[in-house]
């Protein structure tokens, strides 16, 4: 949606430690965060797009669950990711 394939690969390499490792929690959170940021810009222009707003809420919920899982499993990786993405928590 908002990222090209090259940008996605760069994110996977940075947070997944290899090009194949796209399932790691940090990678999923970063990709969701980028999609959420793109949709926030979209909603500044299209205020009545309620179908996409529902998708945004689902993405925010999924990111919240992934962050809770990461916090429960490894607090140091969670803290580093929150600081790197500049998320409020």
Swiss-Prot record:
GO CC term, one of those recorded: cytosolic small ribosomal subunit
Gene Ontology terms for molecular function: rRNA binding; structural constituent of ribosome
Taxonomic superkingdom: Bacteria
Pfam families, sorted: Ribosomal_S15
rRNA-binding in keyword set: yes
PROSITE patterns xref list: RIBOSOMAL_S15
Keywords for the protein's UniProt record, in alphabetical order: Ribonucleoprotein, Ribosomal protein, RNA-binding, rRNA-binding
Database matches in InterPro entries: Ribosomal_uS15, Ribosomal_uS15_bac-type, uS15_NS1_RNA-bd_sf
Listed CDD domains: Ribosomal_S15p_S13e
Signal peptide start and end residues: none
Biological processes, Gene Ontology terms: translation
Quaternary structure (record): Part of the 30S ribosomal subunit. Forms a bridge to the 50S subunit in the 70S ribosome, contacting the 23S rRNA.
Family the UniProt entry places it in: Belongs to the universal ribosomal protein uS15 family.
General function of this protein: One of the primary rRNA binding proteins, it binds directly to 16S rRNA where it helps nucleate assembly of the platform of the 30S subunit by binding and bridging several RNA helices of the 16S rRNA. Forms an intersubunit bridge (bridge B4) with the 23S rRNA of the 50S subunit in the ribosome.
Protein name: Small ribosomal subunit protein uS15
Species annotation: Buchnera aphidicola subsp. Acyrthosiphon pisum (strain APS) (Acyrthosiphon pisum symbiotic bacterium)
């Amino acid at each position: 949606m908002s990222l090209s394939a090259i940008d996605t690969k760069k994110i996977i390499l940075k947070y997944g430690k290899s090009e194949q490792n796209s399932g790691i929690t940090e990678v999923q959170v970063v990709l969701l965060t980028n999609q959420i940021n793109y949709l926030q810009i979209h909603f500044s222009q299209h205020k009545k797009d309620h179908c996409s707003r529902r998708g945004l809420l689902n993405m925010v919920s999924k990111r919240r669950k992934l962050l809770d899982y990461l916090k429960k499993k490894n607090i140091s990786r969670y803290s580093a990711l929150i600081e790197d993405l500049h998320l409020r928590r």
